[in-house]
């Protein structure tokens, strides 16, 4: 990223050195994200962030809706995969149906969505993994059911990206969004869309902008330094498995498998430790298995979430408190009005020692 800013780039398509550099950066970033998603580079677009992209896509899709149609959203999602769709549906006079996650387990069973599907539903929007309580959703099953009902599928993979190998072909989704800062890159948003879906989408754009995907979805001049950072982040993830043979996609597969194993070990250690702290309650899936990632929402009896986070910060452990934009999750759990929950998460660079430090800090409250 610093090299791009230091060396300088121009806009795309100029036919001179600094413009050619921007072209190369863009091409390489599309290839990198195509490898990460198991997609084609022509199906990858970039934007400011996932939220901005979702607002743009929701407005474009809403122009194809009519009164009598319906959409399905969920109570498990980050608000960026909820409010843009609800606002678009409200403005289009379209019914909003909400699939609820299970309060006891934190899981969103595909059957909760299936019950809401009929010929009226034109879109299902759901997360791959919850940013609040760590639940992993069986989005392949959701996609199959939604498509059978004639609906499009829009997946929020922001929270899943650093924890799970993403495969848009296996998911059979129409759209998928992610944010590169979540997988250790710069602040930017990435959109995958099936090529025919992108081509048919009437997006809001200025007249000189490209009329074909993927460029038609990229409003204004993009952050080329961020695109370079995205490529570097994908290469970093691919390198975690070592320098063995295979394509970048194959190396990503190996890396994410190692990450998954390591994070499961940390999660098991954390859950075993928390079980000995009767004042601490973990919300969501209670075991460290494929139904969750290593993201835990906690309530501590007698202590507000903000106070707990502040105490952990004093011993060098930085965790979130509140709702983390998962407003519906906190509402459904009944904790939104009391300050939300503490969120503690583990990724590939965390250690067992850090898990123990977190447990000790919770025990000392």
Where are these regions (language model features)?
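Pyridoxal 5′-phosphate
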Residues: 1-365
């Amino acid at each position: 990223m610093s090299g791009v800013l230091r060396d300088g780039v121009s806009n795309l398509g100029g036919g001179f050195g600094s413009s050619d550099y921007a072209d190369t950066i863009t091409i390489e970033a599309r290839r990198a994200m195509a490898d990460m998603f198991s997609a084609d580079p022509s199906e990858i677009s970039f934007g400011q962030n996932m939220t901005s992209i979702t607002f743009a896509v929701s407005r474009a899709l809403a122009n194809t809706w009519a009164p009598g149609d319906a959409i399905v959203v969920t109570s498990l999602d980050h608000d960026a995969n909820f409010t843009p769709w609800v606002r678009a549906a409200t403005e289009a006079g379209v019914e909003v149906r909400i699939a609820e996650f299970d309060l006891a387990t934190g899981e969103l069973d595909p059957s909760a969505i299936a019950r809401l599907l009929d010929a009226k539903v034109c879109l299902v929007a759901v997360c791959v993994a919850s940013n609040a309580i760590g639940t992993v959703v069986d989005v392949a099953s959701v996609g199959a059911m939604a498509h059978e009902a004639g609906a499009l599928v829009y997946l929020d993979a922001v929270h899943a990206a650093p924890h799970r190998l993403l495969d848009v072909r296996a998911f059979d989704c129409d759209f998928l969004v992610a944010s590169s800062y979540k997988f250790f890159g710069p602040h930017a948003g990435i959109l995958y869309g099936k090529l025919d879906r992108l081509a048919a989408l009437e997006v809001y754009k200025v007249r000189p902008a490209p009329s074909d995907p993927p460029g038609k979805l990229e409003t204004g001049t993009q952050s080329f330094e961020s695109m370079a950072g995205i490529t570097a982040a994908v290469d970093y993830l691919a390198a975690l498995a070592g320098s063995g043979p295979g394509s970048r996609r194959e190396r990503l597969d190996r890396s994410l498998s190692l990450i998954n194993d390591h994070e499961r070990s940390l999660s098991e250690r954390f859950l075993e430790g928390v079980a000995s702290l009767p004042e601490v309650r973990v919300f969501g899936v209670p075991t460290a298995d494929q139904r969750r990632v290593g993201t835990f929402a906690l309530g501590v009896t007698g202590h507000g979430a903000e106070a707990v986070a502040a105490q952990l910060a004093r011993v060098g452990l930085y965790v979130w408190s509140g709702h983390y934009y998962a407003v519906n999750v906190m509402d459904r759990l009944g904790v939104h009005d009391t300050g939300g929950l503490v969120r503690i998460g583990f990724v590939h660079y965390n250690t067992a020692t850090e898990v123990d430090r977190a447990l000790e800090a919770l025990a000392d409250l």
